[in-house]
UniProtKB/Swiss-Prot annotation:
Expressed by the venom gland. Residues 1-20 form the signal peptide. It is found in: Secreted. InterPro entries: Spider_toxin_CSTX_knottin, Spider_toxin_CSTX_Knottin_CS. Keywords: Disulfide bond, Knottin, Secreted, Signal, Toxin. This is U1-lycotoxin-Ls1e. Disulfide bonds join 44-59, 51-68, 58-86, 70-84. The presence of a 'disulfide through disulfide knot' structurally defines this protein as a knottin. PROSITE patterns: SPIDER_CSTX.
Amino acid sequence: MMKVLVVFALLVTLISYSSSEGIDDLEADELLSLMANEQTRKECIPKHHECTSNKHGCCRGNFFKYKCQCTTVVTQDGEQTERCFCGTPPHHKAAELMVGFGKKIFG
């Protein structure tokens, strides 16, 4: 039984060593992907800023991506225009509140 465990441990060690070289290549690809995501994150629209022209470009909040929320504004001339801003929807606010409350209770 001891021989089987030793052989198994050697096989696991060899497999993990050989796969670690492949993981290094994956880590380089992931790093490039993360750098690209960081660039798009810099170009996103922050909370409470106008998103009328780019309704899918809102940034991420603490837990969720902000949503472009639109309202119809009537000017003094009676002209209706749509104005949009990035914000947190009510159901996301409730979820963030519950998570914050849970963190306070459970540490």
